[in-house]
Amino acid sequence: MGQKINPLGFRLGTTQSHHSLWFAKPKNYCEGLQEDQKIRNFIKNYIKKNIRISSGVEGIARIEIQKRIDLIQVIIYIGFPKLLLENRPRRIEELQMNVQKELNCVNRKINIAITRITNPYGHPNILAEFIAGQLKNRVSFRKAMKKAIELTEQADTKGIQVQIAGRLDGKEIARAEWIREGRVPLQTIGAKIDYCSYTVRTIYGVLGIKIWIFVDEKK
């Protein structure tokens, strides 16, 4: 059997960059990682609770964290910032205060910035959320996959592969189904491929969604 490496880790330093930028002593390293995870989870939960989203898509592509001695800079790359920024200054301040309270950090300031991304459906995380929303609403998995591919084609990408695994359409035996459109060169390190794996709970059990999007090739 072929062993499949994570496409993001495989390309770190060439076409992919780290989402956390900071240094720590080896003994404090695990604390830093846990803190990052806490920040990311808190922001995602906050957005889920405070924004009424009809499509079920929160629209977070990624959250970057940069740390200095006295400052934690968090950049949220979001596809639909209007939902979050309807009364912008108050909401961002509220989020900053809540994160600071959650982390219980006295001598470090937290600064949260929001960056809008063009072509939100060209990002696998947002696309996976869209598919998850469709599956929760009992839309057929094939229909959800095809709709996702249509959305990606509008975002001007070179190729996409979508895989859904689990009890598809409530069948008793779990299986994996996938669909590919265009080129997805997973073995080419110079190819910029965005990847996401996402878990969704449905009434039939847990389904796993994996998405590979071929964005561009490094010349």
Swiss-Prot record:
Q: Main localization of the protein?
A: plastid
**Listed GO biological process terms:** translation
Q: Which Pfam families match?
A: Ribosomal_S3_C
Query: Which InterPro entries does this UniProt record tie to the protein?
Result: KH_dom-like_a/b, KH_dom_type_2, KH_sf_prok-type, Ribosomal_S3_C_sf, Ribosomal_uS3_bac-typ, Ribosomal_uS3_C, Ribosomal_uS3_CS
Question: According to its UniProt record, where is this protein located?
Answer: Plastid, Chloroplast
Asked if Transport is a keyword of the record, the answer is no
Which GO terms of the cellular component aspect does the record hold? Answer: chloroplast; ribonucleoprotein complex; ribosome
Q: Which UniProt keywords apply?
A: Chloroplast, Plastid, Ribonucleoprotein, Ribosomal protein, RNA-binding, rRNA-binding
Q: Entry's PANTHER family? A: 30S/40S RIBOSOMAL PROTEIN S3, SMALL RIBOSOMAL SUBUNIT PROTEIN US3C
Which NCBIfam families does this UniProt record tie to the protein?
Answer: rpsC_bact
The name under which this protein is listed is Small ribosomal subunit protein uS3c
The scientific name of the source species is Citrus sinensis
